[in-house]
Amino acid sequence: RATLPARIVGIGGSVGKTTTKELVADLLGTVGRTARTAGNFNNEIGLPLSVLGVDRSCAFAVLEAGISHPGEMAPLRDVLRPDAAVMTTIGPVHIEFFPSVRAIAEEKAALLEKLPADGFAVLDRDDEFFPVLRAHSSAPVVAISLADPAADYFGEISPSGELRVREQATGERADLPVPPPGGFMARNALAAVAAARQCGAAWGALAAALAAYRPVGMRWAVEDVRGWTAVNDGYNANPVSVRAALAAFAEWPVAGRRFLALGPMLELGGREAAEHEAVGRAVAAGEWAGVALVPRQAVAEPAVQALAAGLRAGGWPADKTCAAPDAAAAAEWLRARLRPGDALLLKASRGVRIERVLESLKQES
């Protein structure tokens, strides 16, 4: 690490780290050659490999630091030794191993503790734990917000659907495209824009890079399946990201009806039942043509039962719900209902492998 001339930007947070890492790397690529974490090689094994993989010709390296247990961030930070950092939304991810979400924020904030004085930390002023993160930063804080016009970078969605950004330091404004699916991506894009502007990126180059961005992996991967649209957002799931995906899907342009295939959110510990029931209630408040609940292993598992309980408590009709025993059964239920013009959102934690539903649906019956 000490031999690398690249300016290293560390990416931390609970929700959207890999997407934000890709965005920051794409935008910094308009300034100079930029390395990035391959996939999500972000733990005690993957992060050192990521550092070792940075070419000495790179001007920047955007590397992700991910933790799941207390005490893990400081060693990662000391390997990474970032020159700057970007923190995404903090939420109850891996809450099974922490006493509270605040404890998660405190752990992740360790990434900010040894930033150089000439570096920066991009933090979301709208995040509940902004004060916690700010208190840990040893570098100047660059605040972003979609609500507070006084932030260093204030963003709002224009009537045409673009992200209208105002840079406080210069007074400059720019209308930038929001990567698909829009909605929650505006916050990730604003953080990436703030980081890139701190490193000298030009507005025009940022607009072009955002317009060219495409999601990676099973992150809002859109494909046509015999006339209906599959939106595979099954890379991972937590209470924050599921609600964001539901909101984005509700606004997604669809000619026909919207269906959901939902699976458990893992590593919620003692909050598992309450969080799944709350998500079930949130689903029940939406306008969907049908909801398939997909278990990790068996329909009787508590997370699926809690989702179903939340749906019932929210008044969701039983005839529009399928509590499937497995992915194949969920696919059969959906196959009988999906028609050309419809759309299906798939969302669950990685361990559920909810893409199995889509794989079954793509097979001819």
Residue ranges with predicted function:
Residues 1-125, 129-137, 336, 359-364:
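Phosphate-binding loop of NTP-binding sites
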Residues 11, 217-220, 343, 351, ...:
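ATP-dependent carboxylate/acyl-activation modules
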Residues 11, 47, 64, 76, ...:
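Residue-level signal for inorganic ion chemistry
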Residues 60, 84, 191, 338-347, ...:
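Short SAM/SAH-binding signature in class I
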Residues 86-229, 281-290, 299-314:
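Acidic, Mg2+-coordinating active-site environments of NTP-dependent enzymes
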Residues 92-98, 231, 265-270, 346:
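A short acidic, helix-capping loop that chelates divalent metal ions and anchors anionic groups
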Residues 215-218, 234-316:
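Active-site beta-alpha connecting loops in nucleotide-dependent enzymes
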Residues 319-330:
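Short acidic-hydrophobic, aromatic-tinged amphipathic segments that line or gate anion-handling sites
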